[in-house]
Amino acid sequence: MSTFSPLFDLSMEEDYCQGNKFIPRELKACPECGKPRISFGWCKDCETNSMKENFLYWTSGIKEIDELIRHTQLNASQTCDYLEWIPFDKFEMVKYIGSGGFGSTYSALWMEGPRWIWDDGAQEWARAGPMTVALKRLDNSQEISSSFINQIKAYHKCLQSDLMADTFGITKDPTSNYMIIMKYYKNGNLYQYLDRSNGILSWINIIDTLWGIARGLEKIHAEGKVHRNLHGGNLLVDEKFLIGTRIADVGLHGPCYYHENKSICGVLPYIAPEVLRGEDYSTASDIYSFGIIMNTFSTGKRPWYNRAHDINLAKSICDDERLEIPEDTPKFYAELMQQCWDNDPGKRPTASYLNEKLGEWITLICDNPNPSEIFDEYSIAENRRQIIISQLSDKNTHPEIHPEAYYTSRPLWFLDP
């Protein structure tokens, strides 16, 4: 009888005993070819050959998309480290969720599910079975550009990180628009989560969640990439609490049909001032976006919710006008946030520094028995925050959003020269 195990750490299997020596299971020989696996249950040669054999049995209808999917499969180093072509008839109960700047999102039941259940008896990966997924339709993707496809190809290793939203593959809907298949995150994005929480979260939850986002951003930057479109709508909440927040839309910036995208696209409050002035996106512009996310967490409100997102706001941002910092914000938190949104990109911290600093805060707050200035500031702020939470628990505190404030990506034509 086969024994099925859920997917856990794919990079290292448990050790096993051979004679009087312990040998990592990842070096255990593949039962098919005798070569060592490179990660949990993954024989590079056998998996690659199996995928190559299937190349003749599927096509997206566009050569460049086929090449993209094949590229991810031939370079996979573990299960789900690649994209699949999944016919649309494999999905049931397709339901519209909402629209963004360049597409719409649907939920659906994927009957087969991803190939991420380990069958210990058969020594192979099996499909998980029915799973709810999100289908992100790319508007006008009948005319999808080769530059957009190459963009996904360049970012695909970032997409497969466990710090990003799980991405399974690509399909095509009955209108011939292509769709990205992702895990369905039942708690929605950061804005939706904050709305359900009346915009007030505990400081420890905020810091812990930001730590995970910083690690994801560090991963993107370590790959030599830039997110370019980091905002609250692209942070997806997996669990009831925020610790499972993932970064989405990595490598999916801008309309899919643009061949040379010269216009600035995105959510204005999160775009760094130097980008608004015409400079290229950079790791530093991602850090600016992170600073605005820090403010979104601390206030519980969408940035610049009370102003039109127009040329006047863009000028204000370039003139170093910044968002209000709540009185109950710990000093150490406010200082880091202000560093992130500094008008000079050279003065902003790196993602690596953010990861290190946020991890240090968690240690000082949760695991260090000795008093510290960080812990004292945190304790005062958390006590204030808990009082606010208790006072607002039964009230609707959602502020009225300006009718010309937009929180989905769009081309900012008013910035064009």
Where are the model-predicted features located?
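Glycine-rich ATP phosphate-binding loop
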Residues: W42, S104-D139
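Short beta-strand micro-motifs within the conserved protein kinase catalytic domain, predominantly
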Residues: D166-Y178
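Conserved short submotifs of the Hanks-type protein kinase catalytic core
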Residues: T175-N189
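Activation segment of protein kinase catalytic domains, centered on the conserved DFG
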Residues: D195-W211
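Catalytic-loop of the protein kinase fold
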Residues: H221-D238, G244
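Conserved catalytic-loop aspartate of Hanks-type protein kinases
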Residues: D286
